[in-house]
């Protein structure tokens, strides 16, 4: 029992800074929405539309680079720190290539926005302008993620937290300058949010690089000489590890986007109630997602040390802590669901529906916690391909079709509206959680030599 308590302390020490960093990132989005809304409703809507296209694109790149964390953690655990600098350099090359692709996609996203049914031309122009300003931040964001993943792979999660809050503090005044046109800058409205956010991502990257250059704990990595040229073999391995994670993230984001589109014809009350429950669940999701990042680090580090039993301990501890957290957030959600809904909207019908959906959200949180931590464990084992297959099957083969049938058809019961989609979420996430646990169990039952060989690739 003592080893699990010790491991839980280590996991929480890693996870808490990640949680705070994620809160800072979420707050940046909130600040953009509020400040754009303060300028005009059209500008706020433009930021929302632009963000809905930006997120799937940038999260794809983000997921691809997550492969660095277990790679660096495993090298650190095995004492092969001299190889870390080369992996990081290749991570920067990969981030640069992906940035160019993302920027090209976002530059041409105007075709998607203008093809939306009945969209106001002025709104479309502002949304396109916002995206074309924001896309210049894509390299800064992805370079920052490479540097952050280097730190986190070395079990240094506090720098990412600090840079997140630096970004938030810079974002507010820079937003103000570019939205309203102060200090000689043009008045850009919602487009100014894109300019500010792009600038902030570069500030965060440069601040992180400054930290890495000064950190004593990374002196040996910093001083390691090696080629700065692209290494096709290393980049291919990073892509092999990262692409399944990127696709899994992409399918998860697009699932919720598709459900939002399917709910939209049901009416304002249904859309608002669904959005409230989803937004609050997203806030609660920060906890298990951050714990999953910590579990990836610990499992990768233990495998690097050559201890499959300690890796199992880290995995099991992460799951136990995650279930405890999810149980607490579920109890909190059920107990205060009406009060939470009232924070978003005071329409009685909306509050009633949102409170009802939050009962389902409470169940959803437990399944979600298990599956996201399971995904973190598999990343630690470098078993990322299975994450993609599990996620795709659970969300798009089981979750979405069952949600659609329950919500909008009478094949099983009378159409349930948004509640049907939430039951679909539960079916999908519970299926993912079960499959993740079965895969983890299979991996952990392999001979130690095979586990360590797979982890060292």
Swiss-Prot record:
Ranges of the Extracellular topological domain: 32-52, 114-126, 181-188, 264-275, 335-349, 408-417
Transmembrane annotation, as ranges: 11-31, 53-73, 93-113, 127-147, 160-180, 189-209, 243-263, 276-296, 314-334, 350-370, 387-407, 418-438
Keywords noted in UniProt: Antiport, Cell inner membrane, Cell membrane, Ion transport, Membrane, Sodium, Sodium transport, Transmembrane, Transmembrane helix, Transport
Cytoplasmic side: 1-10, 74-92, 148-159, 210-242, 297-313, 371-386, 439-457
Domain of life: Bacteria
Membrane disposition: Multi-pass membrane protein
CDD domains (alphabetical): MATE_NorM_like
GO molecular function, one term: antiporter activity
A Gene Ontology term for the protein's cellular component: plasma membrane
GO biological process: sodium ion transport; xenobiotic transmembrane transport
Family: Belongs to the multi antimicrobial extrusion (MATE) (TC 2.A.66.1) family. MdtK subfamily.
Protein name per Swiss-Prot or TrEMBL: Multidrug resistance protein MdtK
Originating species: Escherichia coli O157:H7
Gene (name only): mdtK
């Amino acid at each position: 029992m003592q080893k699990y308590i010790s491991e839980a302390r280590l996991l929480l020490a890693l996870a808490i800074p990640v949680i705070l960093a994620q809160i800072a990132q979420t707050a940046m989005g909130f600040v953009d929405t509020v400040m754009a809304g303060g300028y005009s409703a059209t500008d706020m809507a433009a930021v929302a539309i632009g963000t809905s296209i930006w997120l799937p694109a940038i999260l794809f790149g983000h997921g691809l680079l997550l492969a660095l964390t277990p790679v660096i953690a495993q090298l650190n655990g095995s004492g092969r720190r001299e190889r870390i600098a080369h992996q990081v350099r290749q991570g920067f090359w990969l981030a640069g290539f992906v940035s160019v692709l993302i920027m090209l996609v976002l530059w041409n996203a105007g075709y998607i926005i203008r093809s939306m049914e009945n969209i106001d031309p002025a709104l479309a122009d502002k949304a396109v302008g916002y995206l074309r300003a924001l896309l210049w931040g894509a390299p800064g964001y992805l370079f920052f993620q490479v540097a952050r993943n280097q730190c986190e792979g070395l079990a240094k999660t506090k720098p990412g937290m600090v840079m997140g809050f630096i970004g938030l503090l810079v974002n507010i005044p820079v937003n103000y300058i570019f939205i309203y046109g102060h200090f000689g800058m043009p008045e850009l409205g919602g487009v100014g949010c894109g300019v500010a956010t792009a600038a902030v991502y570069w500030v965060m990257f440069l601040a992180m690089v400054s930290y890495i250059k000064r950190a004593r704990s990374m002196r040996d990595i910093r001083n390691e000489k090696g080629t700065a040229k692209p290494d096709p073999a290393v980049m291919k391995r990073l892509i092999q590890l990262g692409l399944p994670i990127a696709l899994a993230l992409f399918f998860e984001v697009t699932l919720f986007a598709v459900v939002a589109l399917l709910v939209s014809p049901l009416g304002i009350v249904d859309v608002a109630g669904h959005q409230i429950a989803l937004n609050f669940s997203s806030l609660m999701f920060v906890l298990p997602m951050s714990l999953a990042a910590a579990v990836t680090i610990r499992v990768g580090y233990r495998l690097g040390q050559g201890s499959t039993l300690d890796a199992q301990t880290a995995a099991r501890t992460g799951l136990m802590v995650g279930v405890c957290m999810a149980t607490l957030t579920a109890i909190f959600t059920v107990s205060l669901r009406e009060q939470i809904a009232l924070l978003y909207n005071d329409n009685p019908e909306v509050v009633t529906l949102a409170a009802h959906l939050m009962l389902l959200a409470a169940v959803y949180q437990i399944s979600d916690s298990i599956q996201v931590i399971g995904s973190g464990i598999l990343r630690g084992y470098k078993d990322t391909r299975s994450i993609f297959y599990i996620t795709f099957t659970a969300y798009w083969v089981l979750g979405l079709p069952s949600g659609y049938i329950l919500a909008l058809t009478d094949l099983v019961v009378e159409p349930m509206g948004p509640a049907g989609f939430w039951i679909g979420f539960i079916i999908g996430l519970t299926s993912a959680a079960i499959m993740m646990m079965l895969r983890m169990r299979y991996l952990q039952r392999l001979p130690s030599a095979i586990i360590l060989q797979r982890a060292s690739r």
